[in-house]
A protein has these predicted regions:
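Conserved N-terminal beta1-alpha1 strand-loop-helix module at the mouth
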Residues: 1-208
Length: 208
């Protein structure tokens, strides 16, 4: 079975970035959305991104930010990938000359095929749980059986994942990557070493 990549999102400190990287994360995510409890300052994000080892991706998460706001972050922070969680259209997402993934909050009536067709330039599509008024980080799972098996974009699966359910999620969805935030935390924005290690071990166990 192909190896499923792991992204640890909502990193707010260099120490937590180090925990994720040491445990084997393929990517870390930093949230540039001021209403999130996991919001990170540009100065801290710069410190983290400048200390990243080779072959670990840094991902910047934005929610309905302006062109200027995203550009300001990019001027100071080395990001390999952008992640858009709001109502951004393809023209906006693709305007920064960076690979990007588009997040979708999945509801029963969501037409994922149609949504993928609206973002042909995306590197992948992130599927998250829907909760009214919350653009991500809900800590809740959704019905993975709603995901078509033939989506044209690589799937990044999010939404309520933790060490106890991620193996089942990988088995059912077979995503390119899984994205975890609250499932490896002590409190919002504060990661737990043991939970990160257990999560990554659970993902790696699906290859056996």
């Amino acid at each position: 079975m192909r190896r499923t990549r792991v992204k640890v999102c909502g990193i707010t400190s260099a120490a937590d970035a180090g925990l994720a990287i040491t445990a084997g994360a393929d990517a870390i995510g930093m949230v540039f959305y001021t209403k999130s409890p996991r919001h990170i300052s540009i100065s801290t994000a710069r410190e983290i991104s400048s200390a990243m080892p080779p072959f670990v991706s840094t991902v910047g998460l934005f929610v309905n930010s302006s062109q200027q706001e995203v550009s300001m972050v990019l001027a100071d922070v080395s990001l390999g990938l952008l992640q858009f969680h709001g109502d951004e259209d393809e023209s906006f997402c693709s305007s920064f000359n960076r690979p990007y993934i588009k997040a979708v909050r999945v509801k029963p009536e969501t037409n994922l095929m149609q949504l993928c067709s609206q973002y042909p330039s995306a590197s992948g599509i992130l599927l998250d749980s829907y909760k009214k008024g919350i653009p991500g980080g809900t800590g809740e799972i959704f019905d993975w059986n709603m995901i078509p098996g033939d989506l044209p974009l690589p799937i990044v699966l999010a939404g309520g994942l933790d060490a106890s359910n991620v193996a089942a999620a990988v088995s059912i969805v077979q995503p390119w990557a899984v994205d975890v935030s609250s499932g490896v935390e002590i409190s919002p924005g504060k990661k737990d070493k043991q939970k990160i290690e257990q999560f990554i071990q659970a993902v790696e166990g699906t290859r056996q």
